[in-house]
Amino acid sequence: MENIKMEMIYFAAAIMLGMAAVGAAIGISLLGGKFLEGAARQPDLMPILRTNFFIVMGLVDAIPMIVVGMALYLIFGVAA
């Protein structure tokens, strides 16, 4: 019974990491596409758009880093 619990914890951590990676990839690709679209429409607003792009990209990329920390806690803290 203990092995099943450990396997489920490892499986949950793997699902967390996979979904975080997919979510970040989709979010950053959508953000990059909208950035290029906005830069093509308004070239004079490029510096403002670039600043906003990097701020929001950092926020989008922060969520998978939090999930990595949670998954590592599950693997090494709870399952150990």
UniProtKB/Swiss-Prot annotation:
Give the PROSITE patterns listed for this entry. ATPASE_C (PS00605)
The cellular location(s) given in this protein's UniProt record come to: Cell inner membrane
Q: Provide GO CC annotations from the record.
A: plasma membrane; proton-transporting ATP synthase complex; proton-transporting two-sector ATPase complex, proton-transporting domain
Tell me the keywords, alphabetical order. ATP synthesis, Cell inner membrane, Cell membrane, CF(0), Hydrogen ion transport, Ion transport, Lipid-binding, Membrane, Transmembrane, Transmembrane helix, Transport
Record site: Reversibly protonated during proton transport = 61
Q: Which GO terms describe its molecular function?
A: lipid binding; proton-transporting ATP synthase activity, rotational mechanism
Report whether Metal-binding shows up as a keyword of the record.
no
Q: How does it sit in the membrane?
A: Multi-pass membrane protein
Q: Which InterPro entries match?
A: ATP_synth_csu_bac/chlpt, ATP_synth_F0_csu, ATP_synth_F0_csu_DDCD_BS, ATP_synth_F0_csu_sf, ATPase_proteolipid_c-like_dom, F/V-ATP_Csub_sf
Q: Does the keyword Transmembrane apply?
A: yes
The transmembrane residues are 8-28, 55-75
Q: Which family does it belong to?
A: Belongs to the ATPase C chain family.
Q: How does it assemble?
A: F-type ATPases have 2 components, F(1) - the catalytic core - and F(0) - the membrane proton channel. F(1) has five subunits: alpha(3), beta(3), gamma(1), delta(1), epsilon(1). F(0) has three main subunits: a(1), b(2) and c(10-14). The alpha and beta chains form an alternating ring which encloses part of the gamma chain. F(1) is attached to F(0) by a central stalk formed by the gamma and epsilon chains, while a peripheral stalk is formed by the delta and b chains.
Question: HAMAP family recorded for this chain?
Answer: ATP_synth_c_bact
Q: State the function annotated in the UniProt record.
A: F(1)F(0) ATP synthase produces ATP from ADP in the presence of a proton or sodium gradient. F-type ATPases consist of two structural domains, F(1) containing the extramembraneous catalytic core and F(0) containing the membrane proton channel, linked together by a central stalk and a peripheral stalk. During catalysis, ATP synthesis in the catalytic domain of F(1) is coupled via a rotary mechanism of the central stalk subunits to proton translocation. Key component of the F(0) channel; it plays a direct role in translocation across the membrane. A homomeric c-ring of between 10-14 subunits forms the central stalk rotor element with the F(1) delta and epsilon subunits.
Q: What is this protein called?
A: ATP synthase subunit c
